[in-house]
């Protein structure tokens, strides 16, 4: 199987390469791509020796001279095109909104998209829905649902449940959240992830996103997709069937498990990393989501019901609001407040092309920045 890894230096991209290392005899690594020509990308090129290494930032002369023999450097879109053309499966592990266009190019080329980038699933929703047979979700929750849904008839499923750990603020009061720091928000209790998705996990916006993703990936009505707090993060997806039975997918909190499933589907491979026993996957408890404290889920659901331009605006607004919080410009609760206000001011038409989708995302970013300058800048 010929594999391309887009966003190779991030968390999921790096773990994909760890999986590849254990299956070199079955996988040909066509190329790795990252935004920056960083030391990490160079070390990956040396260790894994792909055919192509690609960055959007111009590398230094010394960096290029350090590439191992047989590894070809390509810049930007030229490199992306080469990797897509020569790969069969492409892991889209690019972080944030920058993963949207590459996902579209993979689908347009008729290749299999291993979808880890949330924003691309959301913004390309209808395109994803029409090409579902060539999209394998990598996110642990959607990968779990992908597996569960293959074992039942669609008409037998009453509800789909996504599980949320609750993040670092599950037991904090609304009053305490007013003064929550960036450092506290980045301490996820279960998963080791990048900064953006960790903050989305703290606000529970990631679960709002995941509801909409499940809607597009599996063609389920939004109202039939539920979120439940599961602090242990052992259960990744649940189906409630019409006979009142529940099917659950359970595994340790290790992204290499869904990565392996997506790489080798429909086959399964022996897991080559540290395993846990069933007894270690306990206890398992579930709790109701406090939507008065975590407004992001209902806000995302509303954007999903509105559809059209509202979803890419939501994505762009979230990107900018999280960035403002990470840079300590706003408070934790301001993240969702800014997004909500941006959505309330939408006055642009529904996008008809990928270019217009990207413009709507950028509109959401700029609108949040504008509201911030209007209401928050200069405070304190």
Curated annotation (Swiss-Prot):
NCBIfam families for this protein: Dxr
InterPro entries reported in the protein's UniProt record: DXP_reductoisomerase (IPR003821), DXP_reductoisomerase_C (IPR013644), DXP_reductoisomerase_N (IPR013512), DXPR_C (IPR026877), DXPR_C_sf (IPR036169), NAD(P)-bd_dom_sf (IPR036291)
Lineage: Bacteria, Pseudomonadati, Aquificota, Aquificia, Aquificales
Pathway info: Isoprenoid biosynthesis; isopentenyl diphosphate biosynthesis via DXP pathway; isopentenyl diphosphate from 1-deoxy-D-xylulose 5-phosphate: step 1/6
Alphabetical keyword list: Isoprene biosynthesis, Manganese, Metal-binding, NADP, Oxidoreductase
The reaction(s) this protein catalyses: 2-C-methyl-D-erythritol 4-phosphate + NADP(+) = 1-deoxy-D-xylulose 5-phosphate + NADPH + H(+)
Binding residues for Mn(2+): 139, 141, 210
Entry EC no(s): 1.1.1.267
Entry keyword NADP: yes
Stated name of the protein: 1-deoxy-D-xylulose 5-phosphate reductoisomerase
Binding site for NADPH: 9-12, 36, 117, 119, 194
Taxonomic superkingdom: Bacteria
Cofactor: Mg(2+); Mn(2+)
Record: residues binding 1-deoxy-D-xylulose 5-phosphate: 118, 140-141, 165, 188, 201, 206-207, 210
Pfam families hit by this protein: DXP_redisom_C (PF08436), DXP_reductoisom (PF02670), DXPR_C (PF13288)
Family, per entry: Belongs to the DXR family.
Its biological purpose: Catalyzes the NADPH-dependent rearrangement and reduction of 1-deoxy-D-xylulose-5-phosphate (DXP) to 2-C-methyl-D-erythritol 4-phosphate (MEP).
TM spans (from-to): none
GO annotation terms (biological process): isopentenyl diphosphate biosynthetic process, methylerythritol 4-phosphate pathway involved in terpenoid biosynthetic process
Enzyme class, broadest EC rank: oxidoreductase
GO molecular function, one term: manganese ion binding
PANTHER family: 1-DEOXY-D-XYLULOSE 5-PHOSPHATE REDUCTOISOMERASE (PTHR30525), 1-DEOXY-D-XYLULOSE 5-PHOSPHATE REDUCTOISOMERASE, CHLOROPLASTIC (PTHR30525:SF0)
């Amino acid at each position: 199987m010929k594999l391309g890894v887009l966003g190779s230096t991030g968390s999921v991209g790096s773990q994909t390469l760890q999986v590849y290392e254990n299956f070199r005899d079955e996988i040909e690594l066509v190329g790795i791509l990252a935004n920056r020509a960083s030391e990490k990308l160079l070390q990956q090129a040396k260790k894994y020796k792909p055919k192509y290494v690609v960055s959007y930032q111009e590398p230094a002369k010394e960096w290029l001279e350090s590439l191992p023999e047989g590894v070809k450097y390509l810049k930007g879109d030229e490199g992306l095109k080469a990797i897509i053309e020569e790969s069969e499966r492409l892991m889209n592990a690019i972080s944030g909104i920058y993963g949207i266009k590459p996902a579209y190019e993979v689908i347009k080329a008729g290749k299999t998209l291993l979808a880890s980038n949330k924003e691309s699933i959301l913004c390309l929703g209808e395109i994803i829905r029409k090409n579902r047979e060539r999209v394998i979700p990598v996110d642990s929750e959607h990968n779990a649902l992908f597996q569960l849904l293959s074992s039942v008839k669609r008409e037998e499923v009453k509800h789909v449940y996504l599980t949320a750990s609750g993040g670092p603020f599950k037991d904090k009061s609304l009053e305490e959240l007013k003064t929550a720091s960036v450092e506290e928000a980045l301490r996820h209790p279960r998963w080791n992830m990048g900064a953006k998705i960790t903050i989305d996990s703290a606000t529970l916006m990631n679960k709002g996103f995941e509801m909409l993703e499940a809607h597009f990936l599996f063609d389920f009505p939004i109202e039939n997709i539920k979120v439940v707090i599961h602090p242990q993060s052992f259960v990744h997806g649940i189906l409630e069937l019409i006979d009142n039975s529940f099917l659950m997918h359970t595994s340790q909190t290790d992204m290499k498990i869904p990565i392996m499933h997506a790489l080798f589907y429909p086959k399964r491979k022996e897991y080559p990393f540290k395993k846990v026993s069933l007894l270690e996957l306990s206890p398992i408890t579930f709790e109701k989501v406090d939507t008065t404290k975590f407004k992001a889920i209902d806000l995302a659901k509303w954007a999903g019901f509105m559809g059209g331009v509202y979803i890419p605006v939501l994505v762009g607004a979230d990107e900018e609001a999280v960035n403002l919080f990470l840079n300590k410009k706003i408070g934790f609760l301001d993240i969702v407040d800014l997004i909500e206000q941006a959505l309330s001011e939408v006055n642009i038409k529904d996008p008809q092309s990928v270019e217009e989708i990207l413009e709507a995302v950028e509109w959401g970013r700029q609108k949040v920045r504008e509201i911030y300058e209007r209401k928050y800048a200069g405070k304190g």
